Regions:
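Glycine-rich flavin
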Residues: 88-140
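Extended, charge-enriched "interface" segments that sit outside catalytic cores
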Residues: 1-110
């Protein structure tokens, strides 16, 4: 049974099902101003996908279940393995699919590619920030 004890009035509505790119006017303007306007359609598509309730839930799960160090198996044999929640892997796959790890280093890179990559990075950061560390190290 659920008891109604009070009315919550000081919290924003959940950010479910919004376009994280198109709802950020400053980011849209900066992308165009800094020479990556050619990527606006793809950024809008990425922003729509990342703004879904499902994507935001993946971010929550990745943070609720941090990586787990497995030093030994049940028989005492050394493992030295790290187990990640499936949400972490799905978020990493999205980062790679959106080329956040290598966009500016592609052979077909053009003016504004670093800006486009930074915008994609910012969109993913709104969902979950921990996955951005290995992607940044790969990009460096």
């Amino acid at each position: 049974m659920h008891w109604q004890t009070h009315t919550v009035f000081n919290q924003p509505v959940p950010l479910n099902n919004s376009n994280l790119y198109l709802s950020d006017g400053a980011l849209c303007e900066a992308v165009i101003r800094e020479g990556a306007g050619w990527d606006s359609d793809l950024l809008a598509s990425i922003g729509q996908q990342l703004g879904t309730a499902e994507s935001l839930e993946l971010g929550r799960l990745a943070n609720a279940f941090p990586p787990e160090l497995l030093r030994y198996d049940p028989q005492g044999q050394r493992l030295d393995d790290v187990r990640f929640h499936p949400a972490w892997h799905l978020l990493m796959q999205g980062l790679c699919a959106n080329r956040v790890h290598n966009l500016a280093w592609e052979e077909d890179a053009r003016q504004g590619t670093f800006v486009a990559r930074a915008a994609r990075f910012m969109l993913h950061a709104q969902v979950e920030a921990g996955t951005l560390c290995p992607v940044t190290m790969t990009f460096a």
